[in-house]
């Protein structure tokens, strides 16, 4: 499988729009695509899937073992993909607190040439210094092409190309400023793909723009040589929560990693889905229930009125079924959730937890988790935390994890457990050890 990475000097440069437009344009050309998102982001992969028609995997060089990244890449090849298109996160060299786990690390690991998307809106000749610095910063990462974004005029484009010419890095195209290529945002990033009012028209317009302003034939010449990956079957995976896992899935519970489901299915686990917003209950024969993260704060009123959903979860918990919630799912397992307007909505009441968005506080970063006694997890884990919720009250039930940050500093214990019900704000990505 061949591939390349779309990256940028900083967030907000336009790499997501460029990636989506290229995915749709390459799909039109009949390419067998494997979309990838670097890092822990949940939202962009849904856009990648909409643009390409193919499931997008997160590949996270900080939180995932290298052999898992290789195995997931192998799985894409097994599924018939021939071209891996990766979108970076933040700036190319940005990662955890110590810089590890960057998009550049993923490009190096997978031997991907990098196409750098540069926001040119407020610069001309200075672009040469920026691109030269990025091309020289790490010799193990190849900047193979440049896409000029938000170019103001043909004169502006000529100045930019002239400044870059001595660097001998191909300029693959110049995209004009176009407000129609902006994606709507909210506090955790982009609005979810399923909530975009006219996503298909946006993707078609983005693809038309890429086909008009980017030399796709020149892009094809920089795709990396084929690379072999380790077989998925040889790589241990994260232990599943049960033999039949019922997963909440709708606009309130949309943040679940595709690689977790892929790994669990390969271990023979049955996965079924239900919609709390549709007032659906998990299947009675499930021996585990997973409430992933999402935006329950935007739907708290509907969740509070979802009687069948609430009764189904409470009944399962009473039978000793494993019930596990992450971030938004953790908040829903609590007693109440206060929305941004300060209105408190009753939740499931299975954990002594009250949360609020009336006074937002950012919690962000990679985490290493040591499961405590009674946790449904049995091995040290790598995870990510990203939310704006404030804890109003957290009871004295058993804690779930001992937590360290990305550089190893102890940040205390986190999560709650009462019987078979547990949860925390941490999004589990992979395990740290060598055995599942």
UniProtKB/Swiss-Prot annotation:
Residues 244-435 form the GATase cobBQ-type domain. The record marks 427 as: Increases nucleophilicity of active site Cys. It catalyses: hydrogenobyrinate + 2 L-glutamine + 2 ATP + 2 H2O = hydrogenobyrinate a,c-diamide + 2 L-glutamate + 2 ADP + 2 phosphate + 2 H(+). PROSITE patterns: GATASE_COBBQ (PS51274). The active site is at 327 (nucleophile). It is an enzyme of class 6 (ligase). Pfam families: CbiA, GATase_3. Its cofactor is Mg(2+). Its EC number is 6.3.5.9. One of its GO terms (biological process) is cobalamin biosynthetic process. GO terms for molecular function: ATP binding; cobyrinic acid a,c-diamide synthase activity; hydrogenobyrinic acid a,c-diamide synthase (glutamine-hydrolysing) activity. Keywords: ATP-binding, Cobalamin biosynthesis, Glutamine amidotransferase, Ligase, Magnesium, Nucleotide-binding. Pathway: Cofactor biosynthesis; adenosylcobalamin biosynthesis; cob(II)yrinate a,c-diamide from precorrin-2 (aerobic route): step 9/10. It comes from the Bacteria. SUPFAM superfamilies: Class I glutamine amidotransferase-like, P-loop containing nucleoside triphosphate hydrolases. Belongs to the CobB/CbiA family. The a and c carboxylates of hydrogenobyrinate are activated for nucleophilic attack via formation of a phosphorylated intermediate by ATP. CobB catalyzes first the amidation of the c-carboxylate, and then that of the a-carboxylate. PANTHER family: COBYRINATE A,C-DIAMIDE SYNTHASE. Comprises of two domains. The C-terminal domain contains the binding site for glutamine and catalyzes the hydrolysis of this substrate to glutamate and ammonia. The N-terminal domain is anticipated to bind ATP and hydrogenobyrinate and catalyzes the ultimate synthesis of the diamide product. The ammonia produced via the glutaminase domain is probably translocated to the adjacent domain via a molecular tunnel, where it reacts with an activated intermediate. Catalyzes the ATP-dependent amidation of the two carboxylate groups at positions a and c of hydrogenobyrinate, using either L-glutamine or ammonia as the nitrogen source. This is Hydrogenobyrinate a,c-diamide synthase.
